[in-house]
């Protein structure tokens, strides 16, 4: 009888994740023990019907990045603190520029920090239901702000309503922004760049380690973010450093392959030097340069950021993630479209049977071997004709028909067989990849993979690292390839080049939900584009429209700008000021958000990933911006976080129900990978490469659309790259052709020498 009694007692006893998982040393003050120490939160109301949530605010997840730690990746807290730390107030915001364009206007000031700013800002917030007996999903929010601003303390990011409504654990973390988060001297240990992304990654690791302590399931972590936060989510999807830390991802109005979201390593150095000049720290010896910058007050460093970017641009930011060969292994478009060693994958820019984006129509890709990004065992000859495709020859940016990973651009728009292009400095990219650069759509010059800047070839050219291969991977002739050394960040290859880690495979492992709002561009136009303003109808003259195109597509060539004008003009009514305004809305939104995002969706789905897409097209009744701006960038967030559930916010009844429905979609997706369930009405279908279906999210019952901006996005992803490839300066093309041919010959010669040395040591039976 005693064993049965003990068994019943065990079954009925509360578990650590039951309604009594929190300890209470005082009323309404729940306590949780984490891996870094114990914290004491508070119970707070969470909407109508007496709902409550437990909030733990301002939990540190890293050593404060002060003094010599400025510009460095974050350090985890080395030992747990003693005693119980109060987690009942919002943390400091990270240092950032404050928007003063419209003083006193809440529509813009709602995005400014509402807490004191400090470099001691690496804290996170956790909201969870008071007594949920299950292990709910964990939703981890990454805020947007162009990598220049943002804070977890903003009212619009209050996670209590979402946590209570969806019985979820909701987390948000601060990360460093601006130059303090993204100043980049790639390869320098004291300022490698992307430390803001490393902040996010360390917070994500902390969440995974402590999810159970808050009642969450560490195997059901979903990353979600908006704008730069969505781009950050995408970087984690593609980075090998974040693999395994989360299960699902939501990208709201942003993606890592947007033309504003990354720069190259050389451009990162140029911007760092420009900042140094502005604050009195001349660029030279990089260690001394960084020492000078660390000696400046944070506010002075931020003020210097204003001179880094030209003022005549829209949707561009001074300090953003850099392709460092480590966290951001390669440019996002290459990481998405390249295969990076997965056998049988499609080629980097050739998609079997699909339209895709990035200037490829029905390409075959790479057959077997190493797959896309860096060339392979052989490229099937076919009739692909994309901006990077070549008919019967070089099929993609980094591939060759025979050989091993020759670096170059492939061919021109007409499929001519050409040798790879020469080394290009990653100078400021123009909007479509004009000479010396690349953009998110891969126009004219694709960004090169990370390379050690100290490894010259025989002609003095800096060589890229060779791609990964295993010992069983045959080369073009069937010979097994010599094994590569261990791939860590310090292991040289045969030529002394340091090898970047291989990126997380793009697609097939993480379910993705993504989408945009109806008018993505209007919010940015009021910040300096002539003719636009929040207090007028922004009726745009033809002259203002033409000037706005140059600002909306920064650094575009004359021909590219003319193509944009041609495509977005209603030539039956070219001087109509309303149509000119709406066209600029569309140009900025399509170029920066919608088309990159849908290209991301297309590729993720083509690689086997499960994707759901949406268009949010409800204009909030509380929106303070003028009606001509429509449903602007960022104004779905309040519905995702459940702010309409708070009666004091004065939303309509229909908006309360819309918010409940959207929270249910997000919660369902976090739990199961499918937004459907418990909502009623039509089902939200998955996005597929052929159907391209997406859901309209508004106050009406769900409806389904097909091909979100598909036709217009073909202009950005197909036509313009071909146009730029076909019209480069002939004298430059000839010079580049000759130079790169010699580099290519030298590279292949050294590869053959290494292979012959290996084959003498270990004869290859398959030769």
Curated annotation (Swiss-Prot):
Catalytic reaction list: acetylcholine + H2O = choline + acetate + H(+)
GO MF annotation list: acetylcholinesterase activity
GO BP, one annotated term: acetylcholine catabolic process
Entry annotation: catalytic residues: 227, 520, 633
Membrane topology according to the record: Peripheral membrane protein
Keywords: Cell membrane, Disulfide bond, Glycoprotein, Hydrolase, Membrane, Neurotransmitter degradation, Secreted, Serine esterase, Signal, Synapse
Main location: other
Region (Disordered): 401-504
Locations listed in the record: Synapse; Secreted; Cell membrane
Signal peptide: 1-19
InterPro entries with a match to the protein in the record: AB_hydrolase_fold (IPR029058), AChE-related_enzymes (IPR050654), AChE_tetra (IPR014788), CarbesteraseB (IPR002018), Carboxylesterase_B_AS (IPR019826), Carboxylesterase_B_CS (IPR019819), Cholinesterase (IPR000997)
Coiled-coil annotated residue ranges, if any: none
EC numbers, comma separated: 3.1.1.7
PANTHER family: ACETYLCHOLINESTERASE
Protein family membership: Belongs to the type-B carboxylesterase/lipase family.
Task performed by this protein: Terminates signal transduction at the neuromuscular junction by rapid hydrolysis of the acetylcholine released into the synaptic cleft.
Quaternary structure annotation from Swiss-Prot or TrEMBL: Oligomer composed of disulfide-linked homodimers.
Name by which UniProt lists this protein: Acetylcholinesterase
Gene: ACHE
């Amino acid at each position: 009888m005693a064993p049965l009694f003990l068994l019943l007692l065990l079954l009925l006893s509360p578990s650590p994740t039951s309604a009594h998982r929190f300890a209470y040393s005082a009323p309404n003050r729940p306590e949780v023990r984490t891996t870094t120490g114990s914290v004491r939160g508070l119970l707070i109301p969470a909407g109508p019907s007496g709902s409550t949530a437990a909030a733990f605010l301002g939990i540190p997840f890293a050593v404060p990045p002060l003094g010599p730690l400025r510009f460095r990746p974050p350090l985890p807290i080395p030992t747990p603190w003693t005693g119980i730390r109060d987690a009942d107030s919002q943390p400091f915001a990270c240092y950032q520029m404050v928007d003063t364009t419209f003083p006193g206007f809440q529509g813009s000031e709602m995005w400014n920090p509402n807490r004191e700013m400090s470099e001691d800002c690496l804290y996170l917030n956790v909201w969870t239901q008071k007594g949920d007996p299950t292990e709910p999903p964990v939703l981890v929010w990454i805020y947007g702000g162009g990598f220049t601003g943002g804070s977890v303390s903003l009212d619009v990011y209050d996670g209590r309503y979402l946590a209570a409504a969806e019985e979820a654990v909701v987390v948000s973390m601060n990360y460093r922004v601006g130059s303090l988060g993204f100043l980049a001297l790639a390869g320098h240990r004291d300022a490698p760049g992307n430390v803001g992304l490393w902040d996010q990654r360390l917070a994500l690791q902390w969440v995974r380690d402590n999810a159970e302590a808050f009642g969450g399931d560490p195997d059901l972590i979903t990353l979600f973010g908006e704008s730069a936060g969505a781009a950050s989510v995408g970087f984690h999807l593609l980075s090998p450093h974040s693999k395994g830390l989360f299960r699902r991802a939501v990208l709201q109005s942003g993606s890592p392959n947007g033309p504003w979201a990354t720069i190259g390593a050389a451009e990162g150095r140029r911007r760092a030097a420009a900042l140094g000049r502005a604050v009195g720290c001349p660029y030279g010896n990089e260690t001394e340069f960084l020492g000078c910058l660390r000696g400046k007050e944070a506010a002075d460093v931020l003020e210097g950021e204003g001179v880094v970017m030209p003022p005549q641009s829209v949707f561009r930011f001074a300090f953003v993630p850099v392709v460092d060969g480590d966290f951001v292994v390669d440019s996002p478009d290459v990481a998405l479209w390249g295969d990076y060693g997965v056998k049988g994958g499609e080629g980097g820019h050739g998609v079997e049977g699909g339209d895709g984006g990035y200037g490829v129509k029905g390409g075959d890709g790479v057959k077997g071997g190493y797959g896309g990004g860096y060339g392979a065992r052989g490229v099937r000859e076919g009739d692909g004709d994309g901006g990077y495709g070549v008919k019967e020859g070089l099929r993609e940016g980094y591939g060759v028909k025979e050989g091993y990973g020759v670096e170059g651009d492939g061919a021109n728009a007409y499929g001519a067989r050409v040798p790879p292009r020469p080394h290009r400095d990653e100078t400021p990219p123009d909007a479509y990849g004009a000479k010396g650069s690349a953009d998110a759509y891969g126009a004219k010059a694709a960004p090169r993979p990370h390379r050690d800047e100290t490894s010259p070839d025989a002609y003095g050219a800096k060589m890229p690292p060779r791609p990964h291969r295993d010992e069983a991977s045959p080369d073009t002739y069937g010979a097994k390839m010599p094994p590569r050394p261990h791939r860590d960040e310090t292991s040289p290859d045969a030529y002394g080049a340091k090898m970047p880690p291989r990126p997380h495979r793009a697609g097939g492992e993480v379910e993705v939900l993504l989408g945009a709002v109806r008018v993505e561009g209007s919010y940015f136009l009021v910040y300096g584009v002539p003719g636009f303003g929040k207090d007028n109808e922004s009726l745009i003259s033809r002259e203002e429209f033409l000037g706005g195109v140059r600002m909306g597509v920064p650094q575009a060539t004359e021909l590219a700008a003319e193509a944009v004008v041609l495509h977005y003009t209603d030539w039956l009514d070219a001087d109509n000021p309303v149509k000119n305004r709406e066209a600029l809305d569309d140009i900025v939104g399509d170029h920066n958000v919608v088309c990159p995002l849908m290209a991301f969706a297309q590729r993720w789905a083509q690689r086997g990933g499960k994707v759901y897409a949406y268009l949010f097209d409800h204009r909030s009744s509380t929106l303070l911006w003028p009606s001509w701006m429509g449903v602007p960038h960022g104004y779905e967030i309040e519905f995702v976080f459940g702010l309409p559930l708070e009666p004091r916010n004065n939303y309509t009844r229909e908006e309360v129900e819309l918010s409940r429905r959207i929270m249910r979609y997000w919660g369902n997706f976090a739990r199961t990978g499918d937004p459907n369930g418990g909502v009623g009405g039509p089902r939200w279908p998955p996005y597929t490469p052929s159907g391209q279906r997406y859901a309209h999210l508004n106050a009406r019952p769900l409806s389904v659309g097909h091909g979100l901006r598909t036709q217009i996005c073909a202009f950005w992803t197909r036509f313009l790259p071909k146009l730029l490839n076909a019209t480069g300066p002939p004298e430059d093309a000839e010079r580049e052709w000759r130079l790169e041919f010699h580099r290519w010959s030298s590279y292949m010669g050294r590869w053959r020498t290494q292979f012959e040395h290996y084959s003498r040591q270990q004869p290859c039976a398959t030769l």
